[in-house]
């Protein structure tokens, strides 16, 4: 074989192998669990006719466990900021709680916690659904969801546990 054919063939196979490796890592996905520990910094309620609107602001930490890789390092922790808003009527409640999680590198994960059952006072809690909605850095484009359970403790402390969170990056 001529030297040019060897060079061209080698270059082709190198590019092909490189492309295949990139394609294999482009569609990353996995599972993880997390625990959040949140301290409520402020809470306010406004009554309006047949319903009450409640806003809760808090800060805390999130720790990832049972991770099978990707951007969620097993045992790693990050800080979080959260704003919850709740509409409460005699028929129940509707809670939506967006949060921003920042890891040590400065990358941010955006999450929204939603639930329509349970309570939000000390000793209360309930179950809902956590949605992962992208972020910055290693979390950019990431989506996913999982069930969670929240417990409101004395002193404005809140504990959230989520298991079986499925996530993927396109």
Predicted regions and their residues:
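Positively charged n-region of N-terminal signal peptides that target proteins for export
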Residues: 1-6
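Beta-strand-enriched cores of mature, soluble protein domains
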Residues: 24-170
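Membrane-interface motif at the C-terminal end of an N-terminal transmembrane signal
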Residues: 20-22
